[in-house]
UniProtKB/Swiss-Prot annotation:
Record's subunit section: Homodimer and heterodimers.
Example of a GO biological process term: cell wall organization
InterPro entries in UniProt: CASP/CASPL, CASP_dom, CASPL
GO cellular component: plasma membrane
Compartment(s) of residence: Cell membrane
Chain intervals for the UniProt region annotation (Disordered): 1-20
Pfam families: CASP_dom (PF04535)
Entry protein name: Casparian strip membrane protein 1
Function: Regulates membrane-cell wall junctions and localized cell wall deposition. Required for establishment of the Casparian strip membrane domain (CSD) and the subsequent formation of Casparian strips, a cell wall modification of the root endodermis that determines an apoplastic barrier between the intraorganismal apoplasm and the extraorganismal apoplasm and prevents lateral diffusion.
PANTHER family: CASP-LIKE PROTEIN (PTHR36488:SF11), CASP-LIKE PROTEIN 1U1 (PTHR36488)
Residues in the Cytoplasmic compartment per record: 1-48, 120-131, 206-207
Alphabetical UniProt keywords: Cell membrane, Cell wall biogenesis/degradation, Membrane, Transmembrane, Transmembrane helix
Residue spans, topological domain Extracellular: 70-98, 153-184
């Protein structure tokens, strides 16, 4: 009787098997989390560029609008006059100054109208088409604003220094206030050009 022995085989219950299942499924879950974490910084990077794009467009509106207003309000009349002449300087005396006002006003309006597109890029940072459109339009505005600022800068230079070869005297000694406003407008316009170029670079990096 004492020599007899009984062998009992214990099998795993379904509950015990279920208890081990999460341990086996844990690695795929963690790998999925890694994939999500790898994609998140990319979208955040583009979203940050889009936010900076909006800020630069607001700055460009301020500089372009300031340039147009400063040039458009240029008007100075000298305190002395003759029987036949009154010495007065206005921006519309020169076609280049008129073009300058129109070009900067167009640029300011364009930057305001493209802010909604930049907001779309903030909401959906992975979109490519809006950024390509902004690159094209910003390049056109760079050409327009540079042409206006460059043409006006040459005239302002002559107004300050004159040209002895062409017998053109400097007039800024007489029209000091007008020349200061015009010079400030040219500086603001070139700042707008810099802003537009930065916008192009930002859009290119975000593609």
């Amino acid at each position: 009787m004492e020599a007899d022995s009984t062998t009992i085989n214990v099998t795993e219950t379904p509950k015990e098997r279920k208890g081990k299942a999460p341990l086996l499924a844990a690695p795929p879950a963690s790998s999925g989390v890694k994939r999500v974490l790898q994609k998140a910084p990319k979208g955040g990077y583009k979203r940050g560029l889009a936010v900076f794009d909006v800020v630069l467009r607001l700055a460009g509106i301020a500089t372009a609008l300031g340039a147009a207003i400063a040039m458009g309000s240029t008007d100075q009349t000298l305190p002395f006059f003759t029987q036949f002449f009154q010495f007065k300087a206005e921006f519309d005396d020169l076609p280049a100054f008129t073009f300058f006002v129109i070009a900067n006003a167009i640029t300011a309006a364009y930057l305001a109208l493209t802010i909604p597109i930049s907001i779309v890029c903030i909401i959906r940072p992975h979109l490519v088409a809006p950024r390509v459109l902004l690159i094209f339009l910003d390049t056109v505005m760079v050409a327009l604003t540079t042409a206006a600022a460059g043409g006006t800068a040459s005239i302002v230079y002559l107004a300050h220094n004159g040209n002895s070869d062409a017998n053109w005297p400097a007039i800024c000694q007489q029209f000091n206030d007008x020349c200061q406003k015009v010079s400030g407008a040219v500086v603001a316009s070139f700042l707008t050009v810099v802003v537009l170029m930065l916008l192009i670079v930002l859009s290119a990096f975000a593609l």
